[in-house]
Amino acid sequence: MNSEYSKRSLVAVVDDDESVRESLPDLLREFGYAVQAFASAEEFLGSGDLVRTRCLILDIAMPGMSGRDLQRELQRRGWGIPVVFITANRDETLRPHLLERGAVECLFKPFSDTALLAAISSAVRPA
């Protein structure tokens, strides 16, 4: 990965699980990403970080607005932020459906650091 590019890339983590919001940013910062964590989709939408976000790591099942609902809302608003979904739901039919709707990747918890970093690298890679 081009480390200069990664330093300009804000990765937003949206997950209602506090342990995910604490651990993922630490990992991603080690690899040069700027990271902001949010406890809900609504919190992310209300932040000033939409413009800077280059990749969204998004839990599927959250109270209030779900991850899929947030993806649809961003698409409705014309925000083409690449999404990497993460989920504890092992339903294998989810992944192809999410990829069909524009997600970069769907990772099942627990996932490897390598798989997550590969998905983010793919999401932030310049076209």
Where are these regions (language model features)?
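Non-catalytic signal-transmission and effector/linker regions of two-component phosphorelay proteins
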Residues: M1-A12, E18-P25, G46, Q75, ...
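Alpha4 helix (beta4-alpha4-beta5 surface) of REC/receiver domains from two-component response regulators
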Residues: D69, R90-E105
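Receiver (REC) domain active-site loop signature in two-component systems and cognate sites
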Residues: M62
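Two-component/phosphorelay signaling modules centered on CheY-like receiver
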Residues: E18-Q36, R101
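Acidic, metal-coordinating helix/loop segments flanking the phosphotransfer/catalytic sites
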Residues: A37-C55
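Acidic catalytic/metal-coordinating carboxylates
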Residues: A39-S40, S66-L70
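A Lys-centered signature of the CheY-like receiver
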Residues: K109
